[in-house]
C-alpha cells in the first residue's frame, strides 16, 4: 500500500485521490459521497444528473411543451434540480469528510446557468468545479462569486496561458488547480492546436512539465496539476 501524502484541495487537506467526472451521469452523489467519506475528493457529473420525486423515484425528464425554447428551459431546469439533488446525497454520505466537486462540460448549452444555479442551490455542499470540453473562460468568475474553487481542464500549457491572460488572472484566489487531459490518450474532448499533428503523439511528461513551468512562472507554484485523460503514472514514461 502506497502511503500518499495529503495535500490541500479546495481549502482542505485531503488524500489526493480524485474521482473522475465520467461525462453523462457516470458519477453521482453516491459515488462521490463515498470518495469524500474516505477523505478523498468525489466528483459529481452535472450532465443529466438525476433528481427524484416525493417517493424517491428517479424523474424521467420529458418536456411536453411545444416550443423548442420552452423544452430547452425545462431540460435546463431538470439539470439544475439533478445537480442539487446529487450534491445533497453526497453530503449526507460524506458528512464533513473529504471534498465534493462537480464536473460540467463547458460547451453544453447553458452550462454557465447550470453551474451557477447548482452552486447557489447547493450552497456549502460543493467545494470545487471541474470544467472542460472547451475553454471555460467564465468559470473563474462564476465559481469565485459563490466562494467555490475551480479546476479548468486543459491539454497544454498554451491553453492555460490563454485562460489566465483572458480571465483567470482576475480570479486567482479560487483557482484550486489545473486538470491535465492528454489530447492523444484521453477518451474525448481532446484539444489539439493547428500546429500539432494528431498522428504524432507527444510524450505527456514533457507537456505536463511545460504546464508546471508555466504555472510556476505565473506565481502559481502551489497550485496542483491533476493528471487525467489516460495518463497513468510517471513510471510509464
Would you name each region that the model predicts?
Residues 234-237:
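Short, intrinsically disordered, charge-balanced linker/junction segments flanking boundaries
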Residues 223-232:
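Glycine-rich beta-strand-to-loop/alpha-helix junction loops that act as flexible
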Residues 1-221:
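Active-site entrance/lid segments in N-terminal catalytic domains of soluble metabolic enzymes
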